[in-house]
C-alpha cells in the first residue's frame, strides 16, 4: 500500500493507493461505527461497484444513504448539486455527516462542491474510479460545476478528508476514458519530470494494457507530483498555476463542442499541442521534443488537432472568460523544455496572432 501525504495543517490528509482498497475495511478512516454517509455516485459506477462498497460500509456499521446521478460532463451542473442537497436534507444529514464521492471527475467535483457548501462544510472522502480522477482531479481540493458559457466557472477549493485509490477500478474503464486520463499523466512529465516523460515513452503500451504494477506506479508518481504542488501552493497563486497547461484551449473546446462530446483529456491534449508548438516557434521548446510530445499523445490514443469547426474567433469568448485572463492579459503556461515550464503573459490580440496558424 502506498501512502502519500498532503500537508496543509489541520486540513492535511492522505492519498492511499493499492489494488483491492475498495474491499479493505481499514481504508475508510476516519469513519466509525454509527457514522452516517451519503454516497454520491453515477449510474455506471453504481451498476459495477456499489454493492461492493455498500457491503464493506455495512460491515463497518456505517449508515448509508445514496444519491445516484446521471453519467456525463453535461450533468456537472448546479441542478445536480441541488439533487445532492435534497438527498442530504431528506435523510436529515447534519454537520457530522460524510459525503463519499464514488466515481470519476464529474462525481468528484459535484460531491466536493456539495460538501464544501452543505451546512458550510462537511467531510468528504474521494474514491476516484477513472484514471483522470485518480491521478489529478481527486487530489488538491478543486471543486466546480460548469456553466453554459464556460467550464468550471462556479467552484471553490475544499480539501477532502482522504483519497482512496483502487487501481482495480480501471478494469472496467472504457478505452477512450483511459486515454483521456493519460493526457493528464503526460502533462506531469512535460511540466515537472523529464525522467517520468521518458518512462512514459517506454511504458505507454503497458499503461494502455492496464499492466497492474505499471499502472499503480504511474498513479503513485502522478500523485506524488500533485501532492508536492498542492502542499506548496494550495490556492493556485504560484507553482500550482502550471497544472493548467493546455487547459485554456482544452476548456474552450469542451464548452464550444457541448459538454461530453469531447472528453476532458482529449481537449487538454489539443491544448497541450498548441502551447508546445507556440513554445517551439518562439525558440524555447525544441523541434525534437515537440515531436516526442506529439508522438506520445498519439500513442496514448489522444487527438493532437482540435475540431475543424472551431475558428480562431470562436475561441475568443472563452479566452476572455478564462480564469488566467486579467484585464485583457492572458497568462499562458509555456513549456520551456521537457520537465520545465513557466507562465508567460500576452495581450489576447498578440496571443491570437501566435496561434493563428495552429487553429
Swiss-Prot record:
Its EC number is 4.2.3.4. One of its GO terms (biological process) is aromatic amino acid family biosynthetic process. It is an enzyme of class 4 (lyase). It is found in: Cytoplasm. Pfam families: DHQ_synthase, DHQS_C. GO terms for molecular function: 3-dehydroquinate synthase activity; metal ion binding; nucleotide binding. PANTHER family: 3-DEHYDROQUINATE SYNTHASE, 3-DEHYDROQUINATE SYNTHASE, CHLOROPLASTIC. InterPro entries: Dehydroquinate_synthase (IPR050071), DHQ_synth_AroB (IPR016037), DHQ_synth_fam (IPR030963), DHQS/DOIS_N (IPR030960), DHQS_C (IPR056179). This is 3-dehydroquinate synthase. It catalyses: 7-phospho-2-dehydro-3-deoxy-D-arabino-heptonate = 3-dehydroquinate + phosphate. One of its GO terms (cellular component) is cytoplasm. Its cofactor is Co(2+); Zn(2+); NAD(+). Zn(2+) binds at residues 184, 247, 264. The gene is aroB.
